[in-house]
Amino acid sequence: MDQDAAQDSAGLIAEAKGIAISPTMQRRVLVATSNPGKLRDFAGAAEVYGITMVAIPNFSSLPLVLEDGATFEANARKKAEAYSLAVEGELVLADDSGLEIDALGGAPGVHSARYANEEPHLLDSNIKDEANNARVLRELAGMPPEKRTGRFVCVLAAARDGHTLQTFRGVAEGIILDAPRGTDGFGYDPLFFVPQIGKTFAELNAVEKAQYSHRGAALRKFLDWLSPGQRM
C-alpha cells in the first residue's frame, strides 16, 4: 500500500471510531527508541489517527542517555529533551515504563529494564527479558495470586528542540503469574495477567494491546493532545 492509500485507510478507520483528524495535525512523530516491541505498540495505536511513528534516524548511533531519574516522568523527560536536540524542529516522543509489584515494594519500577543486569543495552533483548522475568519469579516464589498484584506504568514525554512540551501517564493493573504465558509480547508481558480479559499481555493481539496496555493508555492521551493540530 502506498503512503497516500495508507493515510486514506487510516482516515476511514478513524472516522469509524469517531476520531476527528485535522488537516493540520502533526503527521509524523519520531520515537526515541530502538526497541521493536515498543515501536509496534506505538505504530499500531497511532495508525487510526493517521499519524506515522518511526524511530529517530540513526538512533543507535546517538549517545546513550543515562536513565538515572527517580521516577518514570524524570527519565522520560530527560530522554525526550536530549534526543530532540539531535533532530532539530521535529516532535520527539520518549517513553519510560516499567512494572511495579506491590509485594516487592514497587520494584522493579524504574529499574525494570535492568532488574537482572545494570547494563541491559549490552545484552540480547531476549536474554535480558528472560533474566528479568526469572528474577521476578524467584522473588515471588510461593506467593498466592492475591499477593501478586502489580501494574505496568508508562510515561511519555513529547519534546521539541530540547524542551518538554507535555507528559502523559498510562497505567494497567494486573497479576503476576508464576510462569510465563504467550509469545507475542516482550519484557514482562508473558507474566502480566489481566483478569478483565483473561489473558497475559503476551497473549494479546495488536488491537487488544493498544486497548488494554499502559502504553496504549498513555499514547491515547498523547494522540488526543496532538489531534487538534497542537505543536506544529
Language-model features and meaning:
Residues 2-4, 8:
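Intrinsic-disorder-associated, low-complexity terminal segments enriched in Asp/Asn/His/Tyr and depleted
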Residues 16-30, 36-232:
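Anionic-ligand binding patches
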